[in-house]
Amino acid sequence: MARYRLIIKPTSSFQTPLHSDTLFGHICWALRYLKGEDELLKFLKLFNDDNSPLILSDGFPKDYLPMPVLRPLSLDEEKELQQKYRTKLEFAREMKMLKKVSYIQVSAMEMLKNELSYYNLYTKHLLGEILLENPNISKTDEVWHNAKNRLTDRVIEGKLFAKEDTFYGKGAELNVYVEDAYFNRKSFCEIFDFISKSGYGADKSVGRGAFEYDLLDGWDFPEAENPNAFMTLSHYHPKEGDFKEGFYDTATKFGKIGGHWASGVDGGPYKMPLLMLNPGSLFFPDTHKTFYGSLIPNVHKQQGVVHYGIALPLKVRIV
């Protein structure tokens, strides 16, 4: 499989996060409009329990990966860490701050790939060997809008509603890691030329979700030499037998149908709610594979509509 690093450079605010499942939906609609419905159906039919011709991660800030979800600190580990602080209050403040960190530097994962635990993470942070903090590349603000009467096409006086927009700083980059066995480099670029021009996510018709992109060949992750677990880099919906146990965070996804179906289709614009496992979640599999999860069928009244639940795994060793 070809490996690409897709570098997204936002040029407007985004209302929709750069999640693997949403990105896959945009790729499918781009393929439908550029190559036709038969080509899209041919692509989707290649997915099965043993084959995934396209594996996508979420979009992460440059040089960062998702913070792993690990076993909580034991009482003994907590006491040991607390001794490094002058007061219990200082320790409590630091722990509160660390629990809000959503990303970890790739260099920190390289150091800890063979001995990953919260205790080791926090110890190296306290010693100054790594720095655990969220990258400062974006800000999320409420943007207020006028409500509109759909019958009269006029603004309703005094009625406002807010939406959250994420604004990215100058030079901000989000990296999506791709494993591709279907498209060649030229056709993959055609897909993202289309998406970058039409926009990504909610309110793209009014300028949200605009971006430029680069596509670089190859990427290497810091993977454990003797792994006993994997960390998902994607929003992931597991299938039976993927793993025995794990540590994870969940999100309920209300997927929305895109393309010309978004303006009206039997069954409405929304898919059925799905429970997804967030990037950074860790699992102990019986065997290590190149991907986990599958396309999820029967998520809408329209036959053939699927949802992307495939995980790009990073092999690690949990201690």
Identify what each model region corresponds to.
Residues 1-319:
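Conserved active-site/ligand-binding neighborhood in enzyme cores
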